[in-house]
Amino acid sequence: MTTREYDYIICGAGSAGNVLATRLTEDPNVTVLLLEAGGPDYRFDFRTQMPAALAYPLQGRRYNWAYETDPEPHMDNRRMECGRGKGLGGSSLINGMCYIRGNALDYDNWSTHQGLERWTYLDCLPYFRKAETRDVGPNDYHGGDGPVSVTTSKPGANPLFEAMVEAGVQAGYPRTDDLNGYQQEGFGPMDRTVTPKGRRASTARGYLDQAKTRPNLEIVTHALADRILFDGKRASGVAYLRGSERATAHARREVLVCSGAIASPQLLQRSGVGPGAWLKELDIPIVLDLPGVGQNLQDHLEMYIQYECKEPVSLYPALKWWNQPKIGLEWMLNGTGLGASNHFEAGGFIRTRDDDPWPNIQYHFLPVAINYNGSNAIEMHGFQAHVGSMRSPSRGRVKLRSRDPNDHPSILFNYMAEALDWREFRDAIRATREIMRQPALDRYRGRELNPGADCRSDKELDTFVRARAETAFHPSCSCKMGYDDMAVVDDEGRVHGLDGLRVVDASIMPIITTGNLNAPTIMIAEKIADRIRGREPLARANVAYYVANGAPARNVAKAVRQPETA
């Protein structure tokens, strides 16, 4: 068994861990060990580097932990997919590359919780900007020299994108030029984490590329964290496995857990930090009975509303093997073409009811009819809207099954457990149909393939959701930040009741944000990195942002085609 000593040990080289490793080692007097259970992000592996290949990593286990939930009681007892990234970059290595920060009111809402006053949107915006290089340059909302490459939609994109955005506007919803700017609400182009050369902009590429040659950073791949070591109530190091070899590393200052919303509570529980009754079931010595570890688990659920496309403009031909070598060659040589896009180039956020204070439904538009993981492709030209609710009141949990670090935990999201979930999904399907029947899509829209035009009553819609809704791969909130009885960490990520231990990843969100989670997770890590280094927070932003204040969710009077009557 080998033992080394560092100032900081980071467990997990994902969206947050790579940020911390890079920022902490900017100080040459600080040493950092970065442990990652997966392997390197091989730059010649098209599965993780080509944006259009985003479905491939989810189909195997090289880059994907491939977790599965327990039977979900409100979803026909299905065991549902819960993919999480494995390798340098973590889930930023296998995600859909949609760069969505969340709504300003998400963070303002966090800040109303006791002790989280420094997490307002205006406190967070400087850290979003710090992390970002946007291809069209900086402004009050966007950065121009950060590690994460963000690309915007360009002229010449698939015509279905603009048609779907215009259809949303024709249905009476707002148009927004920037889903991460002044106004998230509405339909518009979607920013993506893709480099100017058409490669995936993971945090391994953006952050670790600038830090990995530093002598004060040691990166160890294929290193599975087994337990956090404690000296009394102080975290003193990490025991980890590298194949059959056991090793320990000591931390002079802190252990930073950045393993994600599934593995972070799993590691804490395995280390004796979690609900005491759960730990006793597995005869784990209790370091601290902390009841919130693994509780409050949240996710976004979504469904695919699919249509036949009457004109041959969809991406259907690109799914055929005989067309893929040409697509791959153009991407490899030039970084252009169909391979250089994730093809989520437009989307939107809406409120389904006037009394919703900020958007509760998200859309991703895709110019092909296929499941996110590449399965169940419709054998014709088609297009679809990914539609899902943003802040479900349902709560789940992550619970250790065994003390073996190779065993997956028990995961239950408890999807669709509340009446509001069902109301919002029914509203979302009906709103989507109103959007899709607008004139902008007349030349493209064929028959509705899923759920199908005959699926109309509440009962029929509920049956469809129960059988067909899938995860959007946004697990979060399982080690929540705050100061109530179920909080796990304080406003700087420090675990309550312990010293020298922080959790820094999407698990510390108190409530899930409105949209995709990679950008907020990077922001959280940037913000907490300053606190770890003893730096003053960046100055609060001074910008305006949209608040509905009771404005109608939809201007029905301006809709080109009025809602259908029942």
Swiss-Prot record:
Region (Disordered) location: 185-204
The keyword Flavoprotein appears for this protein: yes
Gene: betA
NAD recorded as keyword: yes
UniProt-recorded name of the protein: Oxygen-dependent choline dehydrogenase
Record-linked Gene3D superfamilies: FAD/NAD(P)-binding domain, Glucose Oxidase, domain 3
Family: Belongs to the GMC oxidoreductase family.
One MF term in the entry's GO annotations: choline dehydrogenase activity
GO cellular component, one term: membrane
Residues reported to bind FAD: 7-36
Keywords in alphabetical order: FAD, Flavoprotein, NAD, Oxidoreductase
Described purpose of this protein according to its UniProt entry: Involved in the biosynthesis of the osmoprotectant glycine betaine. Catalyzes the oxidation of choline to betaine aldehyde and betaine aldehyde to glycine betaine at the same rate.
InterPro entries per the UniProt record, alphabetical: BetA, FAD/NAD-bd_sf, GMC_OxRdtase, GMC_OxRdtase_N, GMC_OxRtase_C
Known pathway: Amine and polyamine biosynthesis; betaine biosynthesis via choline pathway; betaine aldehyde from choline (cytochrome c reductase route): step 1/1
Organism from which the protein derives: Burkholderia vietnamiensis (strain G4 / LMG 22486) (Burkholderia cepacia (strain R1808))
Catalytic activity: choline + A = betaine aldehyde + AH2; betaine aldehyde + NAD(+) + H2O = glycine betaine + NADH + 2 H(+)
Lineage of the species this protein comes from: Bacteria, Pseudomonadati, Pseudomonadota, Betaproteobacteria, Burkholderiales
Cofactor needs: FAD
Single Gene Ontology BP annotation: glycine betaine biosynthetic process from choline
PANTHER family according to UniProt: CHOLINE DEHYDROGENASE, MITOCHONDRIAL, GLUCOSE-METHANOL-CHOLINE GMC OXIDOREDUCTASE
EC id: 1.1.99.1, 1.2.1.8
Enzyme class label: oxidoreductase
Residues forming the catalytic site: H474
